[in-house]
Amino acid sequence: MALEKIIRESLTGFIQCHIPHADLSALDEVFYAYATGVLEELGSQNSSEEDFEMESFVEMLEAYIPGFSEISSGKVYDMLFELSRRLSEARGKENVSPKPTAEVSFMTPTSSSTESSKKIETEPLEGAVAQEKDDAKNGIDLLLEIFPSCTVSQAQTALSMAKGDLEDAVQIIVDGKVIADNHSGSKDLQGAPKTDDLKDFILQKYMLVDTEDDKKTYRPVAPKEAPKKMIRYIDNQVVSTKGERYKDIKKPESEEMKKTYINLKPARKYKFH
């Protein structure tokens, strides 16, 4: 965090010095990550001014801060190398290991300020220890629920052998690597449950399996047949009520056409008395 603060303060100060009315709100985390990478390259032992790509850096800054390209490249070089030097010094100070707290406590006199600092340091440690205890208790309860014949001491042993990993602890109990505690007076572990029995137990307790549905045979209901249509229509007129698919239709003829027909029937013979 100290290095990031140095980068932010140096870049914002340099920009405000040369562009007083610049909008610094556009500088986001992506920009500072890019600037950090550039400064790390400059701080390396193999880097030099010739290897540094000034044009790409200026284009990047110009996209965030309009008018940055008008600043001379020499000033930008000086600012970057000075900032890189400051960052390397800050890293060197951070890498220096602090003195042990025990020696400092013997050298400095006891006071209210030192006691308050010790309390502040011990509070996070106590919280972490309490969190670890809660996790271990939850893991032991889960192991006892999965393995009813397992004792608390055996669950603690399996969890410690697995270094807190529940899956490894379950595998250790299944393999029978846990030795019964004779001092506690509890019964010996009567062998780890078989894998099939364990699976059945877990499925029965934590999983809903509908076995009756697997035994059923699916028989779809046949669709009902619609009654046969007996009425036939042509041009929205009923032509049949018996359901024929074909029908002879006589075309209507005009009166003039009827006059052209010849009647071939023989004339009637009339008898006169």
Curated annotation (Swiss-Prot):
Alphabetized InterPro entries for the sequence: CUE_CUED2
Main location: cytoplasm
Region (Disordered): 92-121
Subcellular location field: Cytoplasm; Nucleus
Keywords of the record: Cytoplasm, Nucleus, Phosphoprotein, Ubl conjugation pathway
Recorded family membership: Belongs to the CUEDC2 family.
Protein name: CUE domain-containing protein 2-A
Species this chain originates from: Xenopus laevis (African clawed frog)
Gene from which this protein is expressed: cuedc2-a
